[in-house]
């Protein structure tokens, strides 16, 4: 099974970082894609070009399949949304937010997005 284009939103940093003291040149670091065999485990990460991601950024993860609205999988680092299977888990891994899919299934083939809360100056 191929999990294509594990794309992450560029976080709309100009908007989300407004008034937060985050440099407007900060960008998200990401892997472009992953492949995983059915039943396998894959970990996707979401980092910043400068600084570390921590729980204070309240990392959230979204899954989107073509033609569908994004579905919230994880919010506040590691809280699963209602109805999300426990094979999806969120964490902080080193200095990045991480989404781990354990026991991957064919219908997990999707785009996955990470969103970080960068400040409250809006």
From Swiss-Prot:
Biological process annotations from GO: adaptive immune response; immune response
Region of interest (Complementarity-determining-1), ranges: 50-58
Leader sequence segment: 1-24
SS bonds (residue pairs): 46-114
Region annotation Complementarity-determining-2: where it falls in the sequence: 76-78
Main localization (coarse): secreted
Region called Framework-3, residue ranges: 79-114
UniProt keyword Cell membrane, yes or no: yes
Region (Complementarity-determining-3): 115-122
One GO cellular component term noted in the UniProt record for this chain: plasma membrane
Positions of region (Framework-1): 25-49
Compartment(s) of residence: Secreted; Cell membrane
Keywords associated with the record: Adaptive immunity, Cell membrane, Disulfide bond, Immunity, Immunoglobulin, Immunoglobulin domain, Membrane, Secreted, Signal
Region (Framework-2): 59-75
Residue stretches making up the Ig-like domain: 25-122
PANTHER family in the record: IMMUNOGLOBULIN LIGHT CHAIN (PTHR23267)
Subunit structure: Immunoglobulins are composed of two identical heavy chains and two identical light chains; disulfide-linked.
Protein name per Swiss-Prot or TrEMBL: Immunoglobulin lambda variable 8-61
Species annotation: Homo sapiens (Human)
Gene designation per UniProt: IGLV8-61
């Amino acid at each position: 099974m191929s999990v294509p284009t594990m794309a992450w939103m560029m976080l709309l940093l100009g908007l989300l970082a407004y008034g937060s003291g985050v440099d407007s040149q900060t960008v998200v670091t990401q892997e472009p894609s992953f492949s995983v065999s059915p039943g396998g485990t894959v970990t996707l990460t979401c980092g910043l070009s400068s600084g570390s991601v921590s729980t204070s950024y309240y990392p959230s993860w979204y899954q989107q399949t073509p033609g569908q609205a994004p579905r919230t999988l994880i919010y506040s680092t590691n809280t699963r949304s209602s109805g999300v299977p426990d094979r999806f888990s969120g964490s902080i891994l080193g200095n990045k937010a991480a989404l781990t899919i354990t026991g991957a299934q064919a219908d997990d083939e999707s785009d996955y997005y990470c969103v970080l809360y960068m400040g409250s100056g809006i």
